[in-house]
Amino acid sequence: LPYPWTQKALDGAPRELPCILKSRTGCGSKAVHVLTEETYHEGTVYHEDDIFQEWIAGEEEEYTCGLFRSASGEIRTMILRRKLRGGLTGCGTVEENPAIEALLTSLAKVLELRGSINVQLRLRDGVPYVFEINPRFSSTVRFRHQLGFSDVVWSMQDSVGHGIAAYIPPPKGIHFYKIYEDVIDWKRTNI
């Protein structure tokens, strides 16, 4: 499993710069910083959960992947190339990538996964590098569900011993967008 070097920030200076500074317990990609020679300062006080991680260049090659494995061992995947907005996936495209697919399948087997996880990675020279695994339903769960990857439903069906509903992967190239709405409450006039 290719992955970027990662170390606790409290263990000393990062192995190399540039690198990423983030919390192990973050939410989305909020409070993620790229440290460079100019922005890294020795003696900075870090928190217990802060980590340094190898920076993998190429925001245009960032993916978020849904990975589901049933109790019977059936593996289902969805690969989404994404662009971040405000620390969360703002838009993206359904992709097919044999190297990523092989990595996800291997990961599901090695972890003896039952249920769903979210795997985030970047490609470097065509090789997928996993930089984060979220053992939960991620912020892309609604996108995935609308595209037919119903891992929440499958997880519930599987946990009570029902057969899981069929999955027809969406075609490569479908685009998705997160849209925020402005709402005006004309009934509430006293603030």
Which residue ranges define each predicted feature?
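A conserved helix-loop-beta module that forms one wall/lid of the active-site cleft
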Residues: L1-H33
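ATP-dependent carboxylate activation and anion-phosphoryl transfer catalytic cores
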Residues: E95-I191
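A short, flexible beta-alpha/helix-coil linker loop
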Residues: G26-C27, L84-L88, R136-S139
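A generic fold-level signal
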Residues: A13-R15, C27, H47, E60, ...
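Residue-level signal for secondary-structure boundary sites
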Residues: S29, G73, S139-V141
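Phosphate-binding site of ATP-dependent enzymes
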Residues: V32-E112, R122-L123, V127-Y129
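Broad gene-expression machinery/nucleic-acid interaction feature
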Residues: E16-P18, E62-T64, S116-N118
